[in-house]
Amino acid sequence: MAKILILANSSSGLYGFRNELVVKLLEQHEVHVSLPDDTNNRELEEEGCVLYRTPINRRGMNPIQDIGLFRAYRKLLKDIRPDVVLTYTIKPNVYGGLACRVGRVPYIANITGLGS
């Protein structure tokens, strides 16, 4: 059973727009999710995801906070040892992608929205 780590900046977005994918992944994989405390964390846990509460300032531009996020992602990669990482939204894409690159973990970055 492969381990998949999902990095996102809100459980409401992940649960509201990507829950079908999460449920499908749970059928054959161990799914770990890194999120800040949010409205749908409990629902994701009840479905079978292993949750890690990672604070993210979604709109902030504080480089110290962003370095902290990068370090938190590096620690998660070391602790979980996922086979692949799936990232959503800008900060998880950027800092999760960098952490995966440094840790040599394959990752898939997703951009949300209409692209306009």
Model regions: which residues?
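Nucleotide-sugar donor phosphate/pyrophosphate-binding loop at the beta->alpha transition
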Residues: L14-F17, I64-R71, P106-I108, G115-S116
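Active-site proximal beta-strand in glycosyltransferases
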Residues: A2-L5, C100-S116
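N-terminal strand-loop element at the rim of the active site
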Residues: I6-Q65
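Short His-centered aromatic/hydrophobic patch
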Residues: T87-N93, I111
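An amphipathic, basic-hydrophobic alpha-helix
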Residues: R58-V84, V94, L98, V102
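Structural signature of beta-strand start/N-cap positions in the alpha/beta core
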Residues: K3, E30, R81-V84, P106
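Short beta-strand scaffold positions
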Residues: L35, L86-T87
